[in-house]
Structures are given as C-alpha cells and as structure tokens.
Amino acid sequence: MNDEASKQLTDARFKRFVGVQRTTFEEMLAVLKTAYQLKHAKGGRKPKLSLEDLLMATLQYVREYRTYEQIAADFGIHESNLIRRSQWVEVTLVQSGVTVSRTPLSSEDTVMIDTTEVQINRPKKELANYSGKKKCHAMKAQAIVTSQGRIVSLDITVNYCHDMKLFKMSRRNIGQAGKILADSGYQGLMKIYLQAQTPRKSSKLKPLTAEDKACNHALSKERSKVENIFAKVKTFKMISTTYRNHRKRFGLRMNLSAGIINHELGF
C-alpha cells in the first residue's frame, strides 16, 4: 500500500498497518524532506519514488519484514534502489534524533533492566551466538527503562553472552536512580548498587518461604513495565522473528525502533 492509499485508512488502521501513528509518520516525513533538500540543494534527477512512498516502504519493511524484492515490486521500483534509499532513511532518522538519547537520572527515578533475544540464522561460528535458553542462535539487546516507560539506554551485543556480563560491558552508570529492579539474570547487581533489587533465589536446603514468594511476586509485578516496552518494540516483525540482515546494522535498527516507541509515548 502506498501513501495515497493509506490516506483512506482510519488512524487506528494506519497504526496497525504501518506500525507508527499518523502524526509520527508526518513528523518523520518532515525530517526526511529537510535532509533531502540539503542533500540535493543543487538539483538533480527527480526520484521515481516519492519521499512519502519511500518512508512508507521502509516502515513496511520493518513492520512486516517481507523481502525487499516483494516491497519494491509493490511500489514499481528495482530492489537495489529500495535497499539503497531505505538505508538512507534509517540513518537520517537516527541522526535526526529518532533514537534512544541518554537521559540523566535522579533519586526519584525507578529504573528496570532487562534483555531480550533476537533469533538469527545459524552463523559460521556457531558457538559465539548459541543461546542455551532458547536452543537457537541469537543476539541480545539490553534496555534500561524508567517506571514511566521511557527507554533511557539500549545496548546491543552481536555475540551471545550472559545478562550480567552484557551489563558490565555496557558500563552504564545508573547509581543516581533511587531504585533499580532486575530479574534473576542480574544476580550480583546488589553488590554494585545498594538500591538494586533482584528476586530471592531458593536452594535445596533453603526453599523459599511465603514471604520470599510474596516479595518475588511484588518485584515481578513492579518490573513488568520493561516487558511491556519490549512487547511494543517487537510489534516490528524484524525484531520479533528471525533477523535475516547483516548484523552490523542491527543496533541502528533496534535504536530506531526504540526511538519511535519513546516518541509515541511522549518522551
């Protein structure tokens, strides 16, 4: 569906089809028009695909994750043309600020840390990307989210690693936050930050008491916000299914998706 046909859709159907709100689409389009005018200030040949349709095709690729060949055929252009121009759209939007920007934290903030896995095709060096948890090859993305739902940082690792190891490699300083919530993958975080909370673990000799289970349940309920944010990011099928593209652009696309979520939540 091109931009002209999408004007017949209601706002709710537009959001379901493209993955972003209509107002967000218009703001992204304004950014692209400004960048295009600067790039082609001296004129040049008029492109076959308008900026409106180019943005629509790019968002359809991230939202539906069909092949470039299929989407290019829908818009009547060559596949290589769409690939080249879609990559320009992604880079331009991220450079313009549609990404995760670092936000200073205060003692009144509550932050939640979690990671998600994105499955990839089997690489040449299998063991570097093998996830024993999901029994597949995967990459990891770590997000730090405030209690209001704002993504304050996003870290990517192409090679699979433990959650706590990824946090240490990211070197994120969140000590200013009043409370830090994490799941059991971040055992040991309380040794770094005294305000951190992780679930209480049981052992064969020391099973969980009723109080421990109640604390774990309350912690899980409080940190559900980060799970909701990951669910929003994974409405883009590129993130929720097997990632087929070059892994070097995964971080850029993940930041773009998270930036769109932040923008639509009003941050």
List the model feature ranges, each with a label:
Residues F17-G19, K46-L49, Q60:
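Short secondary-structure boundary/capping segments within folded domains
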Residues S50-E64:
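Short, amphipathic alpha-helical "recognition" segments used to contact nucleic acids or chromatin
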Residues T34-L38, R63-T67, V91, Q95:
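Short helix-loop boundary/capping segments at the starts of domains
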Residues M1-G43, G188:
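Charged, often Cys/His-bearing segments associated with DNA-binding zinc-finger transcription factors
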Residues L51, Y68-F267:
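Short, well-ordered secondary-structure "scaffold" segments embedded in the functional core
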Residues K39-D53:
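Active-site-flanking structural segment that lines cofactor/substrate pockets
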